[in-house]
Structures are given as structure tokens and as C-alpha cells.
């Protein structure tokens, strides 16, 4: 079995693969201050819940956009699983040709998403990831990672509105009954949701225009389904795209090292 770990700024997603299939997955809050033992005990409780043992894990791969957490995570893998984890980063075989000015600047999550999307859906592609930041990645017809756009995530924007405007409440991100809100809450929901739909459609439209292609648009992340329901520009929602990419990269590097 393979343990895959995707560390984001807000949430960490863990998955267990067995014979190429995702059997279990969990989403937990990302904590920069947990020790290796706290991570170990957390995973112990998750494993116990589904009847797994640590010694069933044969490999571990981690992608992270939160460097401070990595020391504790790596130590946890060694102490509790007796496994040196693969870390997505420079020097790892991904099969992705990155055309960024400085390829080392591309976040591990964006690389992993691109690898999975190319493998599953072909190219050209636009991959939209609704996370703490909303990222847009363009992959051309030669399967080259050309770059993209990074915008504040929908949750960050909502929290900023709440914290900076004294009379505006904290709200649930949800589809309002009408685009013309009849209350403060519904008006905020309308502005936030449809403002983000407009952002997605605008950036995707401009990427397509600049590329002079008609790339398939793949969305992932916690709010992907909500946005996709309101827009025709998203072709496929794949909530486990990042975990799939981690499994692919692990297998490529495992085969390479054999």
C-alpha cells in the first residue's frame, strides 16, 4: 500500500492507494506546529478507524507548499513507518517539461496536478485548483507546462471581506437563491460566488485566446464542484487529481530506482 500526502496551506489531504486504486482518503487541518509524534498519533487514529496497520504501508510520497511542516512529517514517516518518503521537488522524475522562467518556483501542488491531468485527460489543458490560492495552469499540446495565473482563493477573499468591513458578517460560501440578493448575507453570497465564476471564466477565456487552442479545462479543490455548477467553461471536476498525481509520480520514481 502507498500513503500519499498533499500538504496545502489550509488543509492536508491524505490517501491510501492499493494496487493503483484510492481506497481511503482524509482531509485534516494543516498545522505548522505539530511534532512528529503528534502526526504519528493522528495517523494512528485514522488507520485504526479503517482497520489498517502501519506495517501495511510500503511507500510514502509527499507534496507540500508549507516548508516548515516538512521536518516533522519526514521524521514521522521514518519513526512510525520506517520509510524514507519521496518528496516532490527538484530532482524528482515527474515527466513534466516545465517552461517557467525559473522552474524551481512552480509549487509542488501545481506540478502534481499537471502530471495527473496530462496522464488522465491528454493535452492541451487548463488546470484550475480551488485551494487557499486559486491557481490556473496551462499545458500545451506538446505536454509542456507553460505557466499560468495565481489569484486569492475564494475563502481568503471571503475572510478579508468579513475582517475589513465592520458591518459585514462571516458567511457560508453557498449558492444564493437569486443573483440579486435581498439580504446582506444573500448579497454577499451572490457577489462572492458569481464574482469568482466571472474570474474563472475570464481567465480561462483569455488563456484560450492567447494559446489559440481549445484546451480542456479540469478543476479540482474543495470548491470546484460549486463553481463548475455555475459555469460552462469547466469540462471536468476531479476532486482527487492531486492524489492521483502523487501516485503516478511515486510509481515513475519507484520504477526508475529499481
UniProtKB/Swiss-Prot annotation:
A monovalent cation. Ammonium or potassium. It catalyses: (R)-pantothenate + ATP = (R)-4'-phosphopantothenate + ADP + H(+). Its main location: cytoplasm. GO terms for molecular function: ATP binding; metal ion binding; pantothenate kinase activity. K(+) binds at residue 129. Pathway: Cofactor biosynthesis; coenzyme A biosynthesis; CoA from (R)-pantothenate: step 1/5. It is found in: Cytoplasm. Disulfide bonds: none annotated. It is an enzyme of class 2 (transferase). One of its GO terms (cellular component) is cytoplasm. It holds the Pfam family Pan_kinase. ATP binds at residues 6-13, 132. It comes from the Bacteria. Its cofactor is NH4(+); K(+). Homodimer. Catalyzes the phosphorylation of pantothenate (Pan), the first step in CoA biosynthesis. PANTHER family: TYPE III PANTOTHENATE KINASE. Belongs to the type III pantothenate kinase family. This is Type III pantothenate kinase.
Amino acid at each position: 500500500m502507498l500513503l500519499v500526502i498533499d500538504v496545502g496551506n489550509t488543509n492536508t489531504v491524505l490517501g491510501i492507494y492499493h494496487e493503483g486504486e484510492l481506497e481511503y482518503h482524509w482531509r485534516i487541518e494543516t498545522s505548522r506546529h505539530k511534532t512528529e509524534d503528534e502526526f504519528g498519533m493522528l495517523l494512528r487514529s485514522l488507520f485504526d478507524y479503517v482497520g489498517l496497520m502501519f506495517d501495511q504501508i510500503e511507500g510514502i510520497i509527499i507534496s507540500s507548499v508549507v516548508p516548515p511542516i516538512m521536518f516533522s512529517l519526514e521524521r514521522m514517516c521514518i519513526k512510525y513507518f520506517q520509510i524514507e518518503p519521496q518528496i516532490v521537488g527538484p530532482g524528482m522524475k515527474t515527466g513534466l517539461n516545465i517552461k517557467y522562467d525559473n522552474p524551481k518556483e512552480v509549487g509542488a501542488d501545481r506540478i502534481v496536478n499537471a502530471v495527473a491531468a496530462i496522464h488522465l485527460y491528454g493535452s492541451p489543458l487548463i488546470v484550475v485548483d480551488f485551494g487557499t490560492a486559486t491557481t490556473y495552469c496551462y499545458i500545451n499540446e506538446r505536454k509542456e507546462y507553460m505557466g499560468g495565473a495565481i489569484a486569492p482563493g475564494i475563502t481568503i477573499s471571503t475572510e478579508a471581506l468579513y475582517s475589513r468591513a465592520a458591518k459585514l458578517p462571516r458567511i457560508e460560501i453557498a449558492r444564493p437563491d437569486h443573483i440579486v440578493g435581498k439580504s446582506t448575507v444573500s448579497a454577499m453570497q451572490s457577489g462572492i460566488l458569481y464574482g469568482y465564476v466571472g474570474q474563472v471564466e475570464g481567465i480561462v477565456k483569455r488563456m484560450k485566446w492567447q494559446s489559440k487552442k481549445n484546451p480542456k479545462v479540469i478543476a479540482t479543490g474543495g470548491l470546484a464542484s460549486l463553481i463548475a455548477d455555475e459555469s460552462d467553461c469547466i469540462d471536468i471536476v476531479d476532486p482527487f487529481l492531486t492524489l492521483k498525481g502523487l501516485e503516478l509520480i511515486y510509481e515513475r520514481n519507484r520504477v526508475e530506482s529499481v
